[in-house]
Amino acid sequence: MTNIRKTHPLMKIVNNAFIDLPAPSNISSWWNFGSLLGICLILQILTGLFLAMHYTSDTMTAFSSVTHICRDVNYGWIIRYMHANGASMFFICLFMHVGRGLYYGSYTFLETWNIGVILLFTVMATAFVGYVLPWGQMSFWGATVITNLLSAIPYIGTNLVEWIWGGFSVDKATLTRFFAFHFILPFIIAALAMVHLLFLHETGSNNPTGIPSDADKIPFHPYYTIKDILGILLLILFLMLLVLFAPDLLGDPDNYTPANPLNTPPHIKPEWYFLFAYAILRSIPNKLGGVLALVSSILILILMPLLHTSKQRSMMFRPFSQCLFWILVADLLTLTWIGGQPVEYPFIIIGQLASVLYFLIILVLMPITSTIENNLLKW
């Protein structure tokens, strides 16, 4: 008799995705981040659900309701900090996952890659609207500044901003709709993640060499299930270390002050995971130019398959491209640091140089370097 997991309509899907899936025998720990992102999403949906049971999306009571969750609700404080720091872990895993894709040439799976980029935008949108909900100073002013950027769009900009706000400023209507968006988007992310996996399983996973691994496959279970469990345990360890020992390490102290439209904080800045894009935005003195650069900094990922000029898929055997990749990583860390600094000398010029270097590496230096490497190998 055939095993039920191979015949039952529902279990068959799970079996083909997580049990009998043929996987390359040599994928490293960089391939763990997909499963970690799945765990992060489940964790965020669960903690978010319990927070939503006690949260009120009204300007008068939002800040108080978050305080109430932390002080009066049983284990409310741990749920709240797991949700806030879970977002940080989510983005750490996301950046690692995207970095892995860039390094090993996984972007040649076009559908999987493009859905991944859409997922990245969706997660960023979710995190942004979520940051507004506690209705602290940085929530309010972050929402005001970032939504205001849409006014740079010619002709329809101002109308678009007022339409999103639901009035002439960030107010009750804005908070209510942002809560609605924040509730629905994670489920859209979950659906997109399933499509992402669907397309990945059409081609099978890439591997560190970038060479097709059809000749050497192993079953996903038990080899990679046990490997994923190790990754999940480490993820939970780091998350709980953050939650229990330094819950406010990655937050902004200004967000412990209730939102006040009459008092602007001295330094408006987003959460750490948006700082690199914020630095690129600020490095251009023109409003529309800054917005275009901001969007391009993420949208540029869609161009990666077009910019791939190497005859090899992975960077594993391409030392010059490896150097450029790690310079790009250092550049992104520099941009993250600059995004959190005040707009003054020398930070302005450092930010501008780092922004130029970011686009220069991706659009110009990487394709040229790949071509040089091809020639050196007489290809």
Swiss-Prot record:
Spell out where the chain crosses the membrane. 33-53, 77-98, 113-133, 178-198, 226-246, 288-308, 320-340, 347-367
Q: Which residue windows are coiled coil? A: none
Note the SUPFAM superfamilies from the entry. a domain/subunit of cytochrome bc1 complex (Ubiquinol-cytochrome c reductase) (SSF81648), Transmembrane di-heme cytochromes (SSF81342)
Q: What is its main location?
A: mitochondrion
GO biological process terms, alphabetically, are: mitochondrial electron transport, ubiquinol to cytochrome c
| InterPro entries reported in the protein's UniProt record | Cyt_b/b6_C, Cyt_b/b6_C_sf, Cyt_b/b6_N, Cytb/b6-like_sf, Cytochrome_b, Cytochrome_b_C_euk/bac, Cytochrome_b_N_euk/bac, Di-haem_cyt_TM
Cited function: Component of the ubiquinol-cytochrome c reductase complex (complex III or cytochrome b-c1 complex) that is part of the mitochondrial respiratory chain. The b-c1 complex mediates electron transfer from ubiquinol to cytochrome c. Contributes to the generation of a proton gradient across the mitochondrial membrane that is then used for ATP synthesis.
Q: What is this protein called?
A: Cytochrome b
Q: Which organism is it from?
A: Megaloceros giganteus (Giant deer)
Lineage, highest ranks first: Eukaryota, Metazoa, Chordata, Craniata, Vertebrata
